[in-house]
Amino acid sequence: MELESLKLDHYRNYSDLTLEFSSGVNVFLGENAQGKTNLLESIYVLALARSHRTSSDKDLVQWQAKEATISGRVKRSISETPLSLHFSNKGKKARVNHLEQSKLSHYIGQLNVILFAPEDLELVKGAPSVRRRFIDMEFGQMNPLYLYNTTQYKRILKERNAYLKRLQLKQTTDTVFLDVLSEQLVDVGSQILIARQEFLNKLELAAQPIHAEISDQREALKLRYMSSVDFASDASLEEVKSVFADALSRQRSREIMQGSTMVGPHRDELQFDVNGNNVAIFGSQGQQRTTALAIKLAEIDLMQQETGEYPVLLLDDVLSELDASRQTHLLLAIQDKVQTFITAPTLSDIARQLIRKPRVFHVKQGVITLENDT
């Protein structure tokens, strides 16, 4: 899979921009605050219909403009597909092959991307919500049903929390509707729990040899999925539903008292252990970065296994955060395999040696020029 071209209209600091890309490595060089990250963000948004930098689509629209459009042409092994996203005060519209999609879950997955940025180092040591979002966004690209279920779960959870708040404030005493919402939450949430466990099992298998290689076989990586629903890793869907329902039943009084759902996928945690220790607490910064890098590289292979296509890799100012050894592992792993977009102030000697025939763009105050045109 590759992104052949990108067009931005009134997106961030770009009024009108069209770029054609190499199927290999594309590099955007420039100082900070020139628009490099905006370019990678636009590719991420084109793929996932949301930004990793802001929760408000209004931030994506250029200052004093009323609407913005991102469009691109995606090449797969057997087809080419035009994609576009249009943002306005009426919301966003997603199109595939020029046809508007009724649901974003029908759109996401047309272009698969993996982003590796300095903040992704927080994947290991950041808040649990960072890791839950990581699972949902990465697995959601591979599995449309999972993406749909997470959307449904959030809707039910919001409604259930609102009703718990009403019970807390004694605006109602009727718990029959709470039973209905609990049943819906269990039905959808149990599917999410099983899917997450299966995804993390596969991710662990893919990441372990990569992690061992980067650490020169000195360290062993283990992924631990710690759910607020205490189900066995090999449990059936019906068994998970039963355990989930029992957990909600036991927590009912506490939930009404606090006006919030205390059990479910939204409370789950992912932990990374290295040599049996939680790397977020006991690991060095080097071990934490090795873990994050191994997970990101494992995603590439796992996405290819699950979808039949390699994803597009976005490296946003991350090379400078890695030492020479980790830079080498990263660049060798993607060589001649994955279309890659890199932003950096400059390229290190290592990067220039390992990146074959990159297409280099220079970015200055939102103006982009090809290196061989300068």
UniProtKB/Swiss-Prot annotation:
Record InterPro entries: DNA-binding_RecF, DNA-binding_RecF_CS, P-loop_NTPase, RecF/RecN/SMC_N, RecF_2
GO BP, sorted A to Z: DNA replication; DNA synthesis involved in DNA repair; double-strand break repair; SOS response
Signal peptide boundaries: none
UniProt keyword annotations, A-Z: ATP-binding, Cytoplasm, DNA damage, DNA repair, DNA replication, DNA-binding, Nucleotide-binding, SOS response
GO molecular function: ATP binding; single-stranded DNA binding
Major subcellular location class: cytoplasm
Domain of life: Bacteria
Residue positions binding ATP: 30-37
Entry-linked Pfam families: SMC_N
One GO term describing the cellular component: cytoplasm
Compartment annotation: Cytoplasm
SUPFAM superfamilies (UniProt xref): P-loop containing nucleoside triphosphate hydrolases (SSF52540)
HAMAP family: RecF (MF_00365)
Family, as annotated: Belongs to the RecF family.
Described purpose of this protein according to its UniProt entry: The RecF protein is involved in DNA metabolism; it is required for DNA replication and normal SOS inducibility. RecF binds preferentially to single-stranded, linear DNA. It also seems to bind ATP.
Name the UniProt record assigns to this protein: DNA replication and repair protein RecF
